[in-house]
From Swiss-Prot:
Gene3D superfamilies in alphabetical order: Ribosomal protein L33
NCBIfam families: PRK00504.1, PRK00595.1, rpmG_bact
GO cellular component: cytoplasm; ribonucleoprotein complex; ribosome
Record's compositionally biased regions (Basic and acidic residues): 16-25
Native source species: Prochlorococcus marinus subsp. pastoris (strain CCMP1986 / NIES-2087 / MED4)
Entry keywords, A to Z: Ribonucleoprotein, Ribosomal protein
HAMAP family in alphabetical order: Ribosomal_bL33
Domain of life where this protein originates: Bacteria
GO biological process: translation
A Pfam family per the record: Ribosomal_L33
SUPFAM superfamilies per record: Zn-binding ribosomal proteins (SSF57829)
Location of region: Disordered: 16-41
Protein name listed in UniProt: Large ribosomal subunit protein bL33
Protein family according to the UniProt entry: Belongs to the bacterial ribosomal protein bL33 family.
Length: 64
């Protein structure tokens, strides 16, 4: 049997969506799900992803 892996599913949420006063395409918060290796990446994940509500690339941070 295979061992349980060190990969966990994490959720990334946009940091600019709640504080931004820019015009929006629609209401809501942009969230992505991805996997990360807990052994190699112990700190919180931070990626630049596309936010469809703001219609631009924004920083998405890992949430619990």
């Amino acid at each position: 049997m295979a061992k349980k892996g060190t990969r966990v599913v994490v959720t990334l949420e946009c940091t600019e969506a709640r504080t931004s006063s820019e015009p929006r395409r629609s209401n809501g918060v942009s969230r992505y799900t991805t996997e990360k290796n807990k052994r190699n990446t112990t700190e919180r994940l931070e990626l630049k992803k596309f936010n469809p509500h703001l219609n631009k690339m924004t920083i998405h941070k890992e949430i619990k």
